[in-house]
Every structure is written in C-alpha cells, then in structure tokens.
C-alpha cells in the first residue's frame, strides 16, 4: 500500500503555505498548483520529508518549489520521490493582496529556479489570456 496522492498534495500545500507565510510575514492563500510530478510511489509508513522554498516573489504572489523525499530509517539516505510548484498570494486582514519581499537567490539551484519561475509565470499568463505572447520576453527568449 502506498500513500494516497491526495494526502501528499495536502501535505505539500501545508508546507508551501508555511514557506510563503514565513517569507511574506502575512496570511497566504493558495492560488494554483502549477505542476506536480509523482515520480515514485511512497510506501505507507515511510519517513516523508517535504521541503518547500519560495523560488521567486513577484509583486503579491510567490512561487513555491517543493521537493519530496523518502528517507531510509536506518541509513538516513534520501530518495527524491516527488516535486511540485505552487503559487501563493499574501493577503491582508480583509483578503486583499499585499506586496511581498523579493527573493535574492544564492545557490546555483536557487538561481535556476528563480529564472525559470518568470518563464513559468509568463507561460501561465499567456495561456490564461492575461498576457500577449509578444510581451512574454523571457518566454520568447527560449525560442530565439
């Protein structure tokens, strides 16, 4: 028997919420689940580690990148099982979106995820009809 995918999604949402709230120091709400990859089944009873980190902050929204690991109890070895990308928005007491602090990526992985976040956001906005494809400069640069 394996961990139910919906249970893992809920755990990832909680971890992403904590990460977004810590970064913004505000109440945050889930806007979207942009990507989920169920790469490896998680057997029931496994030690599951959900790591959530703000990969990029925009004006009021934050992209949260999640890595999920199965940890061997005896050796401590970790095997990556899943990953996901969520978007959260910080809100005030009335539920109105508020600005969030920017992110300064440090590591190579952080810089990679930071740069990719803008492309993912532009793609999402183009697909939703909220951004003209000609204005998606970072996204267009991939095809030049």
Where are these regions (language model features)?
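A conserved, well-ordered hydrophobic junction motif at loop->secondary-structure transitions
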Residues: 1-10, 141-144
């Amino acid at each position: 028997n394996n961990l139910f995918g919906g249970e893992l999604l809920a755990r990832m949402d909680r971890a992403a919420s904590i990460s977004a709230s810590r970064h913004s120091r505000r109440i945050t709400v889930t806007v979207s689940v942009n990507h989920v990859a169920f790469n490896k089944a998680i057997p029931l009873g496994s030690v599951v580690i959900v790591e959530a980190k703000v990969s990029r902050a925009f004006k009021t929204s934050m992209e949260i990148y999640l890595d999920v690991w199965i940890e061997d109890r005896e050796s401590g070895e970790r095997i990556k099982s899943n990953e996901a990308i969520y978007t959260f928005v910080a809100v005030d007491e009335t539920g109105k979106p508020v600005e969030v602090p920017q992110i300064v990526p440090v590591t190579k992985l952080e810089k990679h995820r930071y740069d990719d976040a803008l492309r993912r956001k532009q793609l999402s906005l183009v697909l939703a009809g909220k951004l003209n494809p000609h204005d998606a400069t970072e996204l267009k640069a991939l095809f030049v």
